[in-house]
Amino acid sequence: MKIKLSLILTVAALALSGSAVAEVKIALVAKSLGNGFFEAANVGAQEAAKELGDVKVIYTGPTTTTAEAQIEVLNGLIAQGVDAIAISANDPDALVPVLKKAMQRGIKVVSWDSGVAKAGRQIHLNPSNNALIGETNVKLAADALKALNVEKGDVAVLSATPTSTNQNTWIAEMKKVLPKYPSVNLVTVAYGDDLSDKSYREAVGLLKTYPDLKVIVSPSSVGIVAAAQAVKDQGKIGKVYVTGLGLPSEMAGAVKSGASKSFAIWNPIDLGYAATYLADDLVKGTATKDEASMGKLGKVKLDADGSGAMAEPFVYDASNIDKFSKIF
């Protein structure tokens, strides 16, 4: 009888011990793997997990930037029984059914960077204020035209995919403020699908189709690097500037070569860090409808749709590129 009681107590102790160290499994889902922006976001996510202590971040994503590929990844995560999914979406609407299924099974859902429609998530974290991002891109283009001594010049946008939520929102915001920047003549929007080779081909196509093109604005960290390379390869340095949203580590060469005068971005490390904290806050039930924790970054204020903004974009140029290219 004593042996049986001892066994029961041992099993109970093991069960309690197991529950005490149970990990919160948070899946950080990128638009696609191999993209420096999302690799940097994962660095921040892992930092958040280390701070929280009881969180395991599973970094994953598809190899192609399609909704179908992300849906396959999401179904796998649902089958694994993760506690939360933090995703940068390839399509705002196509992912809703599978994410609804996840939420029905108790999985918390945060979208970050590129959002999911409200029905498919609980919180969305914009990297910055959308209107400010849009105007920053136009101002950068205007600054580039001024550096080229052009009073009014042709400007093209090289975006990611036609269904990319954040890219489309930023481009819409860019168009709204064009009247404030009369030097900027927007001629077209092209799509490189967040793929280096396609973005490069599209950039070359823009340079050939629009011989008077002066600036390419790419709000894609993949597209901006590809466009800068195209400008260099086509012998357009000093005649065409590339700007938009990019990573200092990937754009340092373009700034030094003269293919880019300046560009902007928020810190993707902070974005992954904040998304992980938000997911953890939802899992632990400490988030409210009005605000949620971003750890050391403070609280994010949420609107009626559950959306909030992290920080303002920051401009990088020859004066600071060396410093920040060593960080991300």
Q: What is each model feature region?
A:
Residues 1-21:
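Gram-negative bacterial Sec-dependent N-terminal signal peptides
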Residues 4-5, 22-328:
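A residue-level marker of the well-folded mature domains of exported/periplasmic proteins
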